[in-house]
Swiss-Prot record:
Binding site for Ca(2+) 4: E522, E525, H531
Record bears the keyword Protease: yes
Designated name of the protein: Gingipain R2
Signal peptide feature range: 1-24
A biological-process GO annotation: proteolysis
GO function term, MF aspect, one: cysteine-type endopeptidase activity
Enzyme Commission (EC) number: 3.4.22.37
Enzyme class: hydrolase
Residues at the catalytic site: H440 (proton donor), C473 (nucleophile)
Length: 736
């Protein structure tokens, strides 16, 4: 193995030219602090890049010692045989329909002479050892010009749900291999503006509102995003989930769906064979698209229930993908919907995945001290060709430090050489809540430790289940001839109790060496709330946003990694990091059958409070300023019990009974002071001296009137509310 050592660029001769450029300071993880949005107008944004933490690493090549440059957030996407010249990328929200252009407003640079920049090894797979791949000088080293040429470019536009975006790329290092001159741009200011020409990958229909649940994602992805550009949809932070289930498991999914509704996520079931028979990937993709495009239905999560032979992954050359089902708007690789899978070959396989998910969200207490403990696993390989020029061990050390700063109380490090399966088994059985793995892999095992599917039966971590960010080859290839590594961990149980993991993101193909490291970095940074504008609380939200950062920086290779990095488990899983604390929740013990709202007091802002009736959601609200006011979307019957459920990040879940009292529809069934009739798609309501209101299934008011109302409805479920003679009645109406 070649020895690499860092050599910090000399700045003595350049000190008067740097203009504030920061060299050789310990780089804070995350985004380059020297990249700023200078201005954002309707049709133009200005962005300033300034060099940060430029360093050089010496490597041995066929031409002698050459240098590999790195700087904060710089990414090497150079083609094999061309000079290694990292770029930095930022995403901007742009016009929905116009083509964009980038212009350099100003720039400053210095030059370093007699420099030999090493050639790129290209995209390296984690099926290979980077140290065994030689540096090969390509034809570009004979060309008397600066590479890559332009210091600022635009990538193809992409669409993220309601917003069209475009990535601006800075190439601050320009190298002439004939004269051996390295031009270092210390500052670049660009303007990205609209043109009069029609653009590519446009948004054809601009909504007059945007789903609130993606606001933080927009703010994180786009430098210039402003929430005021749209009117947020009211009270829709949690969105909606559809469970697409193979027919043979339809009767086994009820407990999961009931719990999801109970904890505040509106969840529906669709039998896969009712979409198409036989079930095809194209049919699944089209169904998800149709559900996403339904007006007012904020589809956010899709959970596939079944193995590949039940609900197939989308297969294209070199790709086996569930994630593409969530890529709906435009022709890019940014998901609008978070996708996950309970991969199962038996009812027992499914039951343990349901049980572990419900227990994790519902039953964790202050006695679960295993939370806040993490495991970091790394190979002994990597280095200059990897993300940030890090070896796998350096990469995992950075993650370990981040977790410690956040509050994790114990970090177990299993680094090669010498890691054994027993090291991993002992770590799991001792209690851990998070695993980060970076190394080699196979369909059935981790390369570091050789812990694999044959060792899973030795796990005894009953309901002390970590989630896993896995950077490795084919650990998630659920099309393999036997259960893959990720499937084995999700199906594991001991004496009927779940063991293994509660969720894992793992690849169906050989992963690239560098780009998933950037995705894994971002996942951990989001988990540890490093980015205030990108706070995510679900496994799907954390992992997908981590991959967005990877795609932004690694372009086509990042897209391929995103498409094949598969979520095994519930994408809406509310993740836990530290030992939970208790919430103080107070609410009335009773509710009137005619009530329209229900108020809950809670000392944790951001908690989700939900009233449900035997797995049917009655209403839900977010705790703000110490209270949640739940609007009741469904009729409730007298002398029954509702369930109040309050969930919060790193909190003990609170569940209380609420008794229904007072006048209900059932009490006046034979003497109703109103009539409700449905004919085709027409709802007719009549009642003297009454206020009439119709709500759709999401609780949105769609019609109001006095005394008489005729409403033309779409297919769906509606609540008709009649207020008359001091009483309020609610009836559920189904339009087919």
């Amino acid at each position: 193995m070649k020895k690499n050592f860092s050599r910090i660029v000399s700045i003595v001769a350049f000190s008067s030219l740097l203009g504030g450029m920061a060299f050789a300071q310990p780089a804070e993880r995350g985004r380059n602090p020297q990249v700023r949005l200078l201005s954002a107008e309707q049709s133009m944004s200005k962005v300033q890049f300034r060099m940060d933490n430029l360093q050089f690493t010496d490597v041995q090549t066929s031409k002698g010692v050459a240098q590999v440059p790195t700087f904060t957030e710089g990414v090497n996407i150079s083609e094999k045989g061309t000079p290694i010249l990292p770029i930095l990328s930022r995403s901007l929200a742009v016009s929905e329909t116009r083509a964009m252009k980038v212009e350099v407003v100003s720039s400053k640079f210095i030059e370093k002479k007699d420099v030999l920049i090493a050639p790129s090894k290209g995209v390296i797979s984690r099926a290979e050892n980077p140290d065994q791949i030689p540096y090969v000088y390509g034809q570009s080293y004979n060309e008397d010009k600066f590479f890559p040429g332009e210091i600022a470019t635009l990538s193809d536009p992409f669409i993220l749900r309601d917003v069209r975006g475009q990535v601006v790329n800075f190439a601050p290092l320009q190298y002439n291999p004939v004269t051996k001159t390295l031009r270092i741009y210390t500052e670049i200011v660009v303007a990205v503006s609209e043109t009069a020409e029609a653009g590519q990958n446009t948004i054809s229909l601009v909504k007059n509102s945007t789903f609130t649940g993606f606001e933080d994602i927009y703010k994180s992805v786009f430098m210039n995003y402003e929430a005021t550009r749209y009117t947020p949809v009211e009270e829709k932070e949690n969105g909606r989930m559809i469970v697409i289930v193979a027919k043979k498991y339809e009767g086994d999914i009820k407990d999961f769906v009931d719990w999801k509704n109970q904890r505040g996520l509106r969840t529906e079931v669709k039998v896969a064979e009712d979409i198409a028979s036989p079930v095809t990937a194209n049919a699944i993709q089209q169904f998800v698209k149709q559900e996403y495009e339904k007006e007012g239905n904020d589809l956010t999560y899709v959970l596939l229930v079944g193995d590949h032979k039940d609900i197939p992954a989308k297969i294209t050359p070199g790709i086996k993908s569930d994630q593409v089902y969530g890529q709906i708007v435009g022709n890019d690789h940014y998901n609008e919907v978070f996708i996950g899978r309970f991969s199962c070959e038996s009812k027992e396989d499914l039951k343990t995945q349901i049980d572990r998910t419900i227990h994790y969200e519902r039953n964790i207490t202050t006695e679960d001290k295993w939370l806040g403990q993490a495991l970091c696993i790394a190979s002994a390989e990597g280095g200059p060709s990897a993300d940030n020029g890090e070896s796998d061990i350096q990469h995992e050390n950075v993650i370990a430090n981040l977790l410690t700063q956040y509050g994790y109380t114990k970090i177990i490090k299993c680094y090669d050489p010498g890691v054994t399966p027993k090291n991993i088994i002992d770590a799991f059985n001792g209690g851990i809540s998070l695993v980060n793995y970076t190394g080699h892999g196979s369909e059935t095992a981790w390369g570091t430790s050789h812990f694999g599917t044959t060792h899973v039966k030795q796990l005894t971590n009953s309901n002390q289940l970590p989630f896993i960010f896995d950077v490795a080859c084919v650990n998630g290839d659920f099309l393999f001839s036997m259960p893959c590594f990720a499937e084995a961990l999700m199906r594991a149980q001991k004496d009927g109790k779940p063991t293994g993991t509660v969720a894992i993101i793992a690849s169906t193909i050989n992963q690239s060496w560098a780009s998933p490291m950037r995705g894994q970095d971002e996942m951990n940074e989001i988990l540890c709330e490093k980015h205030p504008n990108n706070i995510k609380r679900t496994f799907g939200g954390v992992t997908m946003n981590g991959m967005f950062a990877m795609v932004e920086k690694y372009k086509k290779d990042g897209e391929k990694m995103l498409d094949t990095w598969t979520v095994f488990g519930d994408p809406s899983l509310l993740v836990r990091t530290l030992v939970p604390t208790e919430m103080q929740v107070t609410a009335p013990a009773n509710i009137s059958a005619s009530a329209q709202t229900f108020e809950v007091a809670c000392d944790y802002n951001g908690a989700i409070a939900t009233l449900s009736d035997d797995g049917d959601m009655v209403g839900t609200a977010i705790v703000k300023d110490g209270k949640a006011i739940i609007k009741l979307n469904e009729s409730i019957a007298d002398e029954t019990n509702l369930t109040l459920t309050v969930v919060g990040y790193n909190k003990v879940t609170v569940i209380k009974d609420v008794k229904v009292e007072g006048t209900s529809i059932a009490d006046v069934a034979n003497d109703k002071p109103y009539t409700v009739a449905v004919s085709g798609k027409t709802i007719t309501v009549e009642s003297p001296a009454a206020g009439l209101t119709i709500f759709d299934m999401n609780g949105r008011r769609v019609a109001t009137a006095k005394n008489r109302m005729v409403f033309e409805a779409q297919n769906g479920v509606y609540a008709v509310r009649i207020a008359t003679e001091g009483k309020t009645y609610t009836e559920k109406v189904i339009v087919k």
